[in-house]
């Protein structure tokens, strides 16, 4: 109550932000008359003038008003479109590391030209990021004339471009592309073997369209570059045959049913667990098929891989449904995006789940892959110096944007008042009653000539409605993951008189629904249309538009509430664009998944008290509130999953940044001769320490073992025992120096034989290849560590802290092994000439050609730390290690005598 009172007096934070920005809008408007008088050449010359001022030390903020006025005037001349004041406000929000919530149809694409132009003036590059290739190409081509008029270059970064084409795209002032492609290019650049192979410049400014889709819906999807691992398809097929023998435990909360079933499903958490009886049954089935030894347990350490396959198969059969979570097309299992309803070809579930679904559907099982490089979108986008985004629905996720990315959300007002009528939800007892009511509503709308957009949450539901409409002889179009090739065409005409369009989650479709249909597309369909044809098309459209407005505008009809309020708001936002008439209503039933899982008891109780009859609906604010609370619960859980993913990935991210920074340093260096000299002393000394412990008596020395090891690993055949027998004054330190000097002399001899330039090139190639191989193994070790870390909770240990501690130890091991392996390879390999180095490089390129890009959707329980989710939610905490923390300037614990930052704290 007091909060509302204070807001009335002082205004909301959003109002205060907009009020501050309005002063700059007034400045831009004041400049408009002067800029209208400029010739085209004078207007174009503004770009060079701004760049000179920036070079002289001016800030972007100081030239913002003039730059925005320049873009507005150029847009009037090139597009005959003038930026509204609210678009100027949106542009300023986007320049200030914030997220602009702008309603559908408010011209987000045109708004983006303002901050894109301003930030491109620095010459550091601007990345405008969209959700798919079609939108990236469309927006780039639409805005290219404006930017080129102002003397800026535009690039498009999409899948399938060659290296030079990608370089050209990134070297442009403004680069349009998809989030996936920018992320993969970052990973590929950090796997390059020469600076010439890199395509990206340092990451400066990212402007993300549909920012909620990319930074929230995609946050659990790591980008992975992978190579094929061993084939285990036979095992998936065998395990798949076990699952139909298992029985679900129906009433997991009832004591009388405990132990009756083989597995239980937790629908809220989207998890499945074996019961004690189920575990025994699976073990017996595995023993019968000869896959498990008699008396052996599925949960023993030796059978972890088998347990992994059984769990994946159970999840595939019980939690993943065909035509809801995936479709089968041309013998392939293709994931369906739960948020947009789009198919995602090329994307695969991780943890062996995709192979288990392939086995379930009887299609070809593709090999599991080994991770070579990976990053989450959360950590990729935090690499940018400046980050901003725009969407029609950000306010419900404002806390997450601020908490994870440090981005405030500003709701930008609409240019015209919104007049869409959002009606209360109607709740029915059964799904059948709900569908009958939906059909009746559609018929009523068609009689009035009002277009209807029906939003469904799954392909299965959209096909069910389509069958009902065929039965009722209602003409309609279906837009879902199976038919999105016709997407733009269907959406463009969804606003025609009496049109009925069924769409699986409309989020991110990228094409506005224009009342009366899209006249631009009609003109584009004609070859060389005459002025008369254009005028006729526009006049016909105006007539249709007026008829649709009179009928009430576009009617949005939701068939089920989504888990996220934001997705529901996106569906509603398709109507009422730019002040158009429109309406929306959601039809629900007690059989809907959200209602069944989260809101059933309370709402069912209300309905029974009201004595509802068949076909009767309940419409009450209490019900709407109960549903909204259910959605909040799901949103909170999903936020916790994303937050925990980030906390785990932050550990890997710190290591990734160290490795990538060091790798780039090595690659950019003309020679790494000094690095090799530094690590050779460490490596040889560490080997000597194993056989001649420091400050030990000679009786404890294992000289034969040392001689053998030096010969096997470093090709050093040294008569150490002979030296000791002949030279009484030879002690531990002088012996150590002689062995290290012997290695240096042997290496110098190799250098004289092949030539310094060839050896320098070979050193770099060995260092990079060894680092890449060990990094790949390290990522696999980190994966295995993460998958089992939740079990530490049973030992009263904090799984997150244990993960941080053990991953640090793994990283220490990586650095130590890297040094040893590099010196060992350089010692053993005989390089004869430049051709040997070139052959090594050719083999590497051949291997590179085999790697593939995967988008792997991380499973929830893999992220939150185990089946029971017992690991408590916590804020990101500092890394805890056993013993004292090693400071960067402290002596390295390895005993080298050097500072930690110059030894194990760095690769060299």
From Swiss-Prot:
Presence of the UniProt keyword Cell membrane in the record: yes
Binding positions for ATP per the UniProt entry: 87, 105-109, 512
Region annotation (Disordered) ranges: 865-908
Localization in the cell: Cell inner membrane; Cytoplasm
Gene Ontology CC terms, in alphabetical order: cell envelope Sec protein transport complex; cytosol; plasma membrane
Alphabetical list of PROSITE patterns matching this protein: SECA, SECA_MOTOR_DEAD
Cofactor(s) required, per the database record: Zn(2+)
EC number(s) reported in the record: 7.4.2.8
Broad class of the protein's primary localization: membrane
An example Gene Ontology biological process: protein transport by the Sec complex
Record-level Gene Ontology MF annotations: ATP binding; metal ion binding; protein-exporting ATPase activity
The entry's keywords: ATP-binding, Cell inner membrane, Cell membrane, Cytoplasm, Membrane, Metal-binding, Nucleotide-binding, Protein transport, Translocase, Translocation, Transport, Zinc
Compositionally biased region (Basic and acidic residues): 879-888
Residue spans of biased composition, Basic residues class: 898-908
InterPro entries: Helicase_ATP-bd (IPR014001), Helicase_C-like (IPR001650), P-loop_NTPase (IPR027417), SEC_C_motif (IPR004027), SecA (IPR000185), SecA_CS (IPR020937), SecA_DEAD (IPR011115), SecA_motor_DEAD (IPR014018)
SUPFAM superfamilies linked to this entry: Helical scaffold and wing domains of SecA, P-loop containing nucleoside triphosphate hydrolases, Pre-protein crosslinking domain of SecA
Subunit structure: Monomer and homodimer. Part of the essential Sec protein translocation apparatus which comprises SecA, SecYEG and auxiliary proteins SecDF-YajC and YidC.
Family (UniProt): Belongs to the SecA family.
Function (record text): Part of the Sec protein translocase complex. Interacts with the SecYEG preprotein conducting channel. Has a central role in coupling the hydrolysis of ATP to the transfer of proteins into and across the cell membrane, serving both as a receptor for the preprotein-SecB complex and as an ATP-driven molecular motor driving the stepwise translocation of polypeptide chains across the membrane.
Name listed for the protein in its UniProt record: Protein translocase subunit SecA
UniProt source species: Shewanella sp. (strain MR-4)
């Amino acid at each position: 109550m007091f909060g509302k009172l204070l807001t009335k007096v002082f205004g909301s934070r959003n109002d205060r932000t907009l009020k501050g920005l309005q002063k700059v809008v007034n400045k831009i408007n004041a400049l408009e008359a002067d800029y209208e008088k400029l010739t085209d050449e004078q207007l174009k010359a503004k770009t060079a003038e701004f760049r000179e001022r920036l070079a002289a030390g001016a800030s972007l903020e100081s030239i913002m008003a003039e730059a925005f006025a320049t873009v507005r005037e150029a847009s009037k001349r090139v597009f005959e479109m003038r930026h509204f004041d609210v678009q100027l406000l949106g542009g300023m929000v986007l320049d200030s590391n914030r997220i602009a919530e702008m309603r559908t149809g408010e011209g987000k694409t045109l708004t983006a030209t303002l901050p894109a132009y301003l930030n491109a003036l620095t010459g550091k590059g601007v990345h405008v990021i969209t959700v798919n290739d079609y939108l990236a190409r469309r927006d780039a081509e639409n805005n290219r004339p404006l930017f080129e008029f102002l003397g800026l270059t535009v690039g498009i970064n999409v899948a399938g471009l060659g290296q030079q084409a990608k370089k050209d795209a990134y070297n442009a002032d403004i680069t349009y592309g998809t989030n996936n492609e920018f992320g993969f290019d970052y990973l590929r650049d950090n796997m390059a073997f020469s600076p010439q192979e890199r395509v990206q410049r340092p990451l400066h400014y990212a402007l993300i369209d549909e920012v909620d889709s990319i930074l929230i819906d995609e946050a659990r999807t790591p980008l992975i570059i992978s190579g094929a691992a061993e084939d285990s398809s036979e095992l998936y097929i065998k395990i798949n045959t076990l699952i139909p023998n298992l029985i679900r435990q129906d009433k997991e909360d009832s004591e009388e049913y405990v132990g009756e079933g083989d597995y239980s499903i937790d629908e809220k958490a989207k998890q499945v667990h074996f019961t004690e009886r189920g575990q025994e049954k699976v073990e017996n089935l595995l023993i019968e098929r000869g896959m498990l030894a008699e008396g052996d347990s599925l949960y023993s350490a030796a059978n972890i891989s088998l347990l992994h396959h059984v769990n994946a198969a159970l999840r595939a059969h019980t939690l993943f449904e065909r035509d809801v979570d995936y479709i089968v097309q041309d013998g392939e299992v293709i994931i369906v995006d739960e948020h947009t309803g789009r198919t995602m070809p090329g994307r695969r579930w991780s943890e062996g789940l995709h192979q288990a679904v392939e086995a379930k559907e009887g299609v070809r099982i593709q090999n599991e892959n080994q991770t070579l490089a990976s990053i989450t979108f959360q950590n990729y986008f935090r690499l940018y110096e400046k980050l901003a985004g725009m969407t029609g629905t950000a306010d419900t996720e404002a806390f997450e944007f601020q908490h994870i990315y440090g981005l405030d959300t500003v709701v930008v007002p609409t240019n015209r008042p919104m007049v869409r009528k959002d009606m209360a939800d109607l709740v029915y007892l059964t799904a059948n009653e709900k569908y009958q009511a939906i059909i009746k509503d559609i018929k009523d709308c068609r009689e009035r000539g009002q277009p209807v957009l029906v939003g469904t949450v799954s392909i299965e539901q959209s096909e069910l409605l389509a069958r009902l409409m065929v039965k009722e002889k209602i003409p309609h179009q279906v837009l879902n993951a199976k038919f999105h090739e016709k997407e733009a065409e269907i959406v463009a005409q969804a606003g025609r008189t009496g049109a009925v369009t069924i769409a699986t989650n409309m989020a991110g479709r990228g094409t506005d629904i224009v009342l009366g249909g899209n006249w631009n597309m009609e003109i584009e369909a004609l070859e060389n249309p005459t002025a008369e044809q254009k005028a006729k098309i526009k006049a016909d459209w105006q007539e249709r538009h007026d008829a649709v407005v009179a009928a009430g505008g576009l009617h949005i009809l939701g068939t089920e509430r989504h888990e996220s309020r934001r997705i529901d708001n996106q569906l509603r936002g398709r109507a009422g664009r730019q002040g158009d008439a429109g309406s929306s209503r959601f039809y629900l039933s007690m059989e809907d998944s959200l209602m069944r899982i989260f809101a059933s008891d309370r709402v069912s109780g209300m309905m029974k008290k009201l004595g509802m009859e068949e076909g009767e609906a309940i419409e009450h604010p209490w019900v709407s509130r109960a549903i909204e609370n259910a959605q909040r619960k799901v949103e909170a859980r999903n936020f916790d999953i994303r937050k925990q993913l980030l906390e785990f990935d932050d550990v890997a991210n710190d290591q990734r940044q160290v490795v990538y920074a060091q790798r780039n340093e090595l690659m950019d260096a003309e020679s790494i001769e000094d690095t090799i000299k530094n690590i050779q002393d460490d490596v040889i000394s560490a080997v000597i320490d194993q056989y001649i412990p420091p400050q030990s008596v000679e009786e404890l020395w294992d000289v034969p073992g040392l001689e053998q090891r030096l010969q096997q690993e470093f090709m050093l055949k040294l008569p150490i025992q002979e030296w000791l027998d002949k030279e009484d004054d030879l002690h531990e330190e002088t012996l150590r120096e002689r062995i290290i000097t012997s290695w240096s002399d042997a290496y110098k001899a190799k250098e004289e034989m092949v030539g310094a330039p060839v050896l320098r090139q070979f050193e770099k190639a060995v260092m990079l290849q060894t680092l890449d191989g060990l990094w790949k193994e390290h990522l696999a070790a980190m994966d295995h560590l993460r998958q089992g870390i939740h079990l530490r909770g049973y030992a009263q240990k904090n799984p997150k802290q244990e993960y941080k501690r053990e991953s640090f130890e793994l990283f220490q091991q990586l650095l130590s092994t890297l040094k040893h392996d590099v010196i060992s390879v350089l010692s053993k390999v005989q390089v004869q000439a430049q051709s040997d180095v070139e052959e090594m490089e050719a083999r590497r390129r051949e291997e590179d050609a085999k790697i593939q890009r995967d988008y792997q959707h991380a499973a929830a329980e893999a992220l939150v730390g185990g089946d029971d989710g017992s690991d408590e939610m916590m804020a990101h905490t500092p890394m805890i290690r056993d013993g004292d923390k090693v400071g960067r300037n402290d002596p390295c614990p390895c005993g080298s005598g050097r500072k930690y930052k110059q030894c194990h704290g760095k690769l060299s």
